[in-house]
Amino acid sequence: MESAPIVLDNGTGFVKVGYAKDNFPRFQFPSIVGRPILRAEEKTGNVQIKDVMVGDEAEAVRSLLQVKYPMENGIIRDFEEMNQLWDYTFFEKLKIDPRGRKILLTEPPMNPVANREKMCETMFERYGFGGVYVAIQAVLSLYAQGLSSGVVVDSGDGVTHIVPVYESVVLNHLVGRLDVAGRDATRYLISLLLRKGYAFNRTADFETVREMKEKLCYVSYDLELDHKLSEETTVLMRNYTLPDGRVIKVGSERYECPECLFQPHLVGSEQPGLSEFIFDTIQAADVDIRKYLYRAIVLSGGSSMYAGLPSRLEKEIKQLWFERVLHGDPARLPNFKVKIEDAPRRRHAVFIGGAVLADIMAQNDHMWVSKAEWEEYGVRALDKLGPRTT
């Protein structure tokens, strides 16, 4: 294990890191960097307050910190802060000497080329890695499922990508980005709870509401029925105990919260909802490959974990096909096949696919961009990673 390639999946909300062959990330922690609001307190409880707090450490004392997310919508926006996160990853968590090691990094589709170049430059020049490979997250999610073609719906904390892939090649001209994801759903749940009189306004409360969302929220299959149930019965009502011991009642908010994925206007976005986005993406593909895409709609990322999401997507995509392609003719509907791949481990699908790929590549030095190639060719060395969008 000591010499195995490192697999690092940088997400907007969480960093996932481990080694080739691992079935799960060794470590997962929030992608946050915090600095104390006041320097007066040196210690709180048994946590030492430092000038820069990162990841789990920052999360533990979040209310005392000015918190920054170095990544937005899946893309690194602040490399200075990102270096703090990477230092924490390699030296505090993995406790390794990165010099001469191999590392597989992940990137979103449509990641700006300059970003990939800066990321690789940092790995070679700041940390001294011997080999670097950058893989597109959606392709790794497919590999985790043992597939090479399909539409990956990768919904994390900061962004949802809809990525059609055919025979391991991303169809870049069709990649879609829906700027509604986990963080938006959490904010929306905060506003729904506020209407009930429960105020969550501190940064520390955000984490509390996120956990509540993950435990209680689900995607409604039939909105009218759920609305009726919440209005006329207490079937949907759940008690939830907050960290300070208070108990609150959560009812209709359980299904209203994830609804922002299907109705983005609820969180101020003018984009189409998730089902329509997927349908439009596949319909824009070449007619010969559409059937392969419909038969492998692969869910990936933490915001795809809601109970009820796969069946709602299937129902709405079939409905869209019925209305827009068949124009309401039910005779041909049985020939239309949709399959939603909802693997139980899809929260970590990108990491799992990365660990599989890094293991296959471990003994094939020519597949990695080496430090020697970087020193000789500079950013041109990255051409061997294959064509990428600019």
Swiss-Prot record:
Compartments in which it is found: Cytoplasm, Cytoskeleton, Actin patch
Entry keyword set: Actin-binding, ATP-binding, Cytoplasm, Cytoskeleton, Nucleotide-binding
Record has Zinc as a keyword: no
Binding-site list for ATP: G156, D157, G158, R210, E211, M212, K213, E214, G301, G302, S303, S304, M305, Y306
Name of this protein: Actin-related protein 2
Source superkingdom: Eukaryota
Complex and partners: Component of the Arp2/3 complex composed of arp2, act2, arc1/p41-ARC, arc2/p34-ARC, arc3/p21-ARC, arc4/p20-ARC and arc5/p16-ARC.
One GO-annotated biological process of the protein: actin cortical patch assembly
Pfam families attached to this UniProt entry: Actin (PF00022)
Name of the encoding gene: arp2
Major place of residence: cytoplasm
An example Gene Ontology CC term for this record: medial cortex
The protein's role, per its UniProt record: Functions as ATP-binding component of the Arp2/3 complex which is involved in regulation of actin polymerization and together with an activating nucleation-promoting factor (NPF) mediates the formation of branched actin networks. Seems to contact the pointed end of the daughter actin filament. During cytokinesis it colocalizes to the cortical actin patches until spetation is complete. Has a role in the mobility of these patches. Essential for viability.
GO MF term list: actin filament binding; ATP binding
Family: Belongs to the actin family. ARP2 subfamily.
